[in-house]
Structure formats: C-alpha cells, structure tokens
Amino acid sequence: MAKQTTMKNAALKQLTKDADEILHLIKVQLDNLTLPSCPLYEEVLDTQMFGLQKEVDFAVKLGLVDREDGKQIMLRLEKELSKLHEAFTLV
C-alpha cells in the first residue's frame, strides 16, 4: 500500500511539473518570440496541452491519479495560461 501511495504521489508530482514546464515554455515564447494571436503560438500551446492531457489520461487509466486530480491540474494550467494571455493582449 505504501508503494502505491508513493507511486501516486510521484505521478501527481510529475504531472504538476510537466504543467509548470508548459507554462514556462509559453511564457518564454510570448516574451521572446510571438504574440498570442500568432498561429505558431497557438500550435505550440495546443500541442503541449494535448500531450499533457494524454499524460493525465494515461495516469488515470493506470490508477496512479484520480480523474478529479487530473482535471484540477489541467484546470490550473488553463487558468494560468488565460491570465498570461490576458496580460500580453492588454499590453
């Protein structure tokens, strides 16, 4: 049981880390390369979000992450990206 809890914690930690890396990638992209209206920005964002959602789905299927925890990771990232997008479009 302890090993399963450790695996679940590791999975949640990794998914959260991946979400944070996506947020960082998008911040760097906006700071240095593109505007939120650029198709390249949208493509990178869509690809990264799709990949993270697949990671979450896989972890849920393996029983490493509760579906609700996975949704919360995605929701938190979407909210942060929305704030970031607003900040760059208001400038």
Curated annotation (Swiss-Prot):
Superkingdom, taxonomy of origin: Bacteria
Pfam families listed in its UniProt record: DUF1507
Family: Belongs to the UPF0358 family.
UniProt-recorded name of the protein: UPF0358 protein SAB0977
Organism for this UniProt entry: Staphylococcus aureus (strain bovine RF122 / ET3-1)
